[in-house]
């Protein structure tokens, strides 16, 4: 009887040991999950977000706005550009050293031809935080005086300050539009005759040459 009780006791002990060993092997996975949700240290965040050259995908049309007759493949390219934060709101991240890089891009002329050619792009190699440039010139105070000339000058200065605040024609495709700085009116760079020469139609909403609707 004592032998039987002793055997049962050791069997239970062995089962408990095996159960514990199984959970011990699974423990590294739990630690790995905790590591994946680890809080990023302040200095790591600071260094990675500070003003520096970083790879950015840039739209080719942004660099070559006048070549609207082409379709580029790929439509964007990876370039090193200055980006990041500065310690003061009065400062901005600007390039202090630049270089050119040449890439092979496919140029496609719809219904005509396509070829792979070389295109040059600007890259930033060094960046610094420098004082922001004042983009709006301070308006000069008009001298008090009589006459139509003084009134015309005052009207002109008021009109200039208003024209600075024109909303852009299109955020994504600025290169396809032309904006009158005085009236803020947007018009297409492409013309109807230019599109028809390529057997296309001018889309006045997007200012692109599209295939004719049937």
UniProtKB/Swiss-Prot annotation:
Biased composition regions of type Basic residues, renumbered to the chain: 143-159
Residue segments, region Disordered: 131-159
Positions glycosylated per UniProt: 100
Ranges of Basic and acidic residues composition bias in the record: 131-142
GO terms classed as biological process: angiogenesis; angiogenesis involved in coronary vascular morphogenesis; apoptotic process; artery morphogenesis; blood vessel development; blood vessel morphogenesis; blood vessel remodeling; bone trabecula formation
Protein's UniProt keywords contain Secreted: yes
A GO molecular-function annotation: vascular endothelial growth factor receptor 2 binding
CC per GO annotation: adherens junction; basement membrane; cell surface; cytoplasm; extracellular space; membrane; nucleus; secretory granule
Places the protein is found: Secreted
Tissues expressing the protein: Expressed in the pituitary, in brain, in particularly in supraoptic and paraventricular nuclei and the choroid plexus. Also found abundantly in the corpus luteum of the ovary and in kidney glomeruli. Expressed in the ductal epithelial cells of post-pubertal mammary glands. Expressed in the ductal and alveolar epithelial cells throughout the whole period of gestational evolution, lactation and involution.
Record keywords, A-Z: Angiogenesis, Developmental protein, Differentiation, Disulfide bond, Glycoprotein, Growth factor, Heparin-binding, Mitogen, Secreted, Signal
UniProt KW Signal keyword: yes
Entry similarity comment: Belongs to the PDGF/VEGF growth factor family.
Record protein name field: Vascular endothelial growth factor A
Species this protein is from: Rattus norvegicus
Taxonomic lineage from the root: Eukaryota, Metazoa, Chordata, Craniata, Vertebrata
Gene: Vegfa
């Amino acid at each position: 009887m004592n032998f039987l009780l002793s055997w049962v006791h050791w069997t239970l002990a062995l089962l408990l040991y095996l159960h514990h060993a199984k959970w011990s092997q699974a423990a590294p996975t739990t630690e790995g999950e905790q590591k994946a949700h680890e809080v990023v240290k302040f200095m790591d965040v600071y260094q990675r977000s500070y003003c520096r050259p970083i790879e950015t995908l840039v739209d080719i049309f942004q660099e070559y706005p006048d070549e609207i007759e082409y379709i580029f493949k790929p439509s964007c390219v990876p370039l090193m550009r200055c980006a990041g934060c500065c310690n003061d709101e009065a400062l901005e991240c600007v390039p202090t050293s630049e270089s050119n890089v040449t890439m092979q891009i496919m140029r496609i002329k719809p219904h005509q031809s396509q070829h792979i050619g070389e295109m040059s792009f600007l890259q930033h190699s060094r960046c610094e935080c420098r004082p922001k440039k004042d983009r709006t010139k301070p308006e000069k105070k008009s001298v008090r005086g009589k006459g139509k000339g003084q009134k015309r000058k005052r009207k002109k200065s008021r009109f200039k300050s208003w024209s600075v605040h024109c909303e852009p024609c299109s955020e994504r495709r600025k290169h396809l539009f032309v904006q009158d700085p005085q009236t803020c009116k947007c018009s297409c760079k492409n013309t109807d005759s230019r599109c028809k020469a390529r057997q296309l139609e001018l889309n006045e909403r997007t200012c692109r040459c599209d295939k004719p609707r049937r």
